[in-house]
Amino acid sequence: MNEQYSALRSNVSMLGKVLGETIKDALGEHILERVETIRKLSKSSRAGNDANRQELLTTLQNLSNDELLPVARAFSQFLNLANTAEQYHSISPKGEAASNPEVIARTLRKLKNQPELSEDTIKKAVESLSLELVLTAHPTEITRRTLIHKMVEVNACLKQLDNKDIADYEHNQLMRRLRQLIAQSWHTDEIRKLRPSPVDEAKWGFAVVENSLWQGVPNYLRELNEQLEENLGYKLPVEFAPVRFTSWMGGDRDGNPNVTADITRHVLLLSRWKATDLFLKDIQVLVSELSMVEATPELLALVGEEGAAEPYRYLMKNLRSRLMATQAWLEARLKGEELPKPEGLLTQNEELWEPLYACYQSLQACGMGIIANGDLLDTLRRVKCFGVPLVRIDIRQESTRHTEALGELTRYLGIGDYESWSEADKQAFLIRELNSKRPLLPRNWQPSAETREVLDTCQVIAEAPQGSIAAYVISMAKTPSDVLAVHLLLKEAGIGFAMPVAPLFETLDDLNNANDVMTQLLNIDWYRGLIQGKQMVMIGYSDSAKDAGVMAASWAQYQAQDALIKTCEKAGIELTLFHGRGGSIGRGGAPAHAALLSQPPGSLKGGLRVTEQGEMIRFKYGLPEITVSSLSLYTGAILEANLLPPPEPKESWRCIMDELSVISCDVYRGYVRENKDFVPYFRSATPEQELGKLPLGSRPAKRRPTGGVESLRAIPWIFAWTQNRLMLPAWLGAGTALQKVVEDGKQSELEAMCRDWPFFSTRLGMLEMVFAKADLWLAEYYDQRLVDKALWPLGKELRNLQEEDIKVVLAIANDSHLMADLPWIAESIQLRNIYTDPLNVLQAELLHRSRQAEKEGQEPDPRVEQALMVTIAGIAAGMRNTG
């Protein structure tokens, strides 16, 4: 174990040294000395030296406005480098990687050793594997794309430096390259100047596909195939594609007025353009590789006399011409030109697949399997995973927008006001119209801009090539009519196929009603006919936690899933649960394997569909090797959850969870909603107001510009509390509830739940992780620098609460200290704290200066503003999961 850490530590200190040299070259010895002094003070402050802690605070408070930015940048860049070293560590032969792709082998061996599972059962479970990862543009990815590219290259240098046999001159060359990259990063502005547009966000998503997934997915399938051959003697079929990627970038218009129908149309074209671009590179390689002459009669018949000399090349060159013509047409469309569709335009995956597969079969039949299973097989697998659309898009819109559109329409038609009808009347109207053969929308109707936008979006879906749009997600869904309304709007747009429409249940009440809503829908004959035995439901993690606190929310999510699984099973419907979880604990994030195995039994039968958000995309898919590792973890977890499902919780455990849920929700809401001091405290103790200035995502931070916590989006809410290290949304209420149940004499029952029920042990594990990242002296320092004295008692109360919570969690988990069973994560948090602490102290100081200036009516000092942005980005890097 320690050898693993020493490799990581030596990389971290080597990168730190290079950064130090860069700072010295750029700004001189005195700034480097200042940074070094602060680092040493921070280290001994962490080790418990109070005098040094005081000195650290004084030093940072006394920095001049000129020193603020370089010091903030030094620690922020250091954390980016530490994250890069850690990312490399997770895939290096000396580090964690030694164990990751092994996950599949371990899982297969574990399954084979179960007497009740035959090899055939395991094989069937593998064949039905389905994993759909939905990339979302969350503003939490605050690192600029240009810096991400440089960090990827730093990673590559670390990999080569790990090779013990490199010659001295190569070693020197690599070190020189590292110095260049770190200097380039230092001299690059790490804060975006402008908010990204939805199209920029989509391009960021395509960059992830190009730089990592394109190579990572075929590598993962090779790995999976090897493990299956070794352990089960089973080969994956060529067309097997368990992984799909979908994106919300350019499709998610919920609360984001910048995502319009035109934007979605543009992103769909852009996505197809990028696919042709990537496939052209693949085909170019195949043109040079497939120079073979021998072919089957079927292939020769396909190429005719003209191509008989080099049949494989002939087919590849033809495909290349079609791709080029398609790309040229898409390019013209993106520029706004209206061109007739060219002959041979590629719109369907089959058109890509058929010539490639014909070559594959012929090579296999002629004894050239070794060639068939090279680059050609990788390309075939990319056709199945990415295909013509590259990534599919989800459309997401809030339920009230559909209700308002239909209200405007019924008023125009003079048949009443849909918005004020009862649920039963709405359903009757919708079902009547869904069954009607005549159109509902009058030709000469001029709807409002809002309604026109909703109708135009449905039009885009109807016109898009089939297979390029994955699902229509309805946020804040509350009733069956919310789902039927979307089906009606899609029918009116002339959509010719059954588009999956997924209600998203995201508040506590909506989660509790989810099963009733779906039961009512499944009782409608017309609806049952339409969905053809398949239903997708999305479970919202972040908004439910913001609404009720993390303990009540997670229990409501569990129960909603459990009830939906049973309802759909009874109705013979294949249910896909779509999990909208974020990177941070307060938004449902948890280590993947643990999180999946803690769901109700049967929840992964319809496959896994999950959002991957913001910075988590980079941590989990930023490099091909990490992609292999993340996909392997998911694969192992899905197989295990489906073949060895977790136990049904005992009735007494459910009762305890009900109790915990009620108590924790009351405590949480008692502070967040009912305590009149809470919102002013939140606004002053965290950088919430300042966060709005960061050019983070393309969507506004608030659903409504004025208003309390409920109008804040879940992301800024969590982001703000992560910055001041109180991490409040991820624990408030949970520990108090546990304490109450312990006092009622049920500690041994809680210990049994922790031991034998994955759902409960994962909850406690997530609390431990949050407590390990939280920091009470820093949270207290923010109060002292920024909060009105009258509100100090509230801050103290919350900090005392957290201390009590830590004790009760450790007692139930039988641990002597936090993260006892995950020393690697504890180590990684400790390593980063030394660099994050000064940024926190500095941030409190900067907030103090900037708010003082505002109070005195002065213009904000650009150096202070810039340094503040840098601390926000740096702390986000230090916490590793921002919002």
Swiss-Prot record:
Q: Which Gene3D superfamilies match?
A: Phosphoenolpyruvate/pyruvate domain
Pfam families assigned to the protein according to its UniProt record, in alphabetical order? PEPcase
- Root EC class: lyase
For this protein, the parts annotated as crossing the membrane are none
| Active-site residues, as the UniProt record annotates them | H138, K546
> One Gene Ontology cellular component annotation?
cytosol
A GO term (biological process) for this protein?
A: tricarboxylic acid cycle
Catalytic activities: oxaloacetate + phosphate = phosphoenolpyruvate + hydrogencarbonate
E.C. no:
4.1.1.31
Give the cofactors, semicolon-separated: Mg(2+)
For this chain, the annotated S-S bridges are: none
Query: Which GO molecular function annotations are given, in alphabetical order?
Result: magnesium ion binding; phosphoenolpyruvate carboxylase activity
SUPFAM superfamilies linked to this entry: Phosphoenolpyruvate/pyruvate domain
Protein family membership: Belongs to the PEPCase type 1 family.
Q: What does this protein do?
A: Forms oxaloacetate, a four-carbon dicarboxylic acid source for the tricarboxylic acid cycle.
Q: What is the name of this protein?
A: Phosphoenolpyruvate carboxylase
Question: Which organism's genome codes for this protein?
Answer: Escherichia coli O81 (strain ED1a)
Q: What is the lineage of its organism?
A: Bacteria, Pseudomonadati, Pseudomonadota, Gammaproteobacteria, Enterobacterales
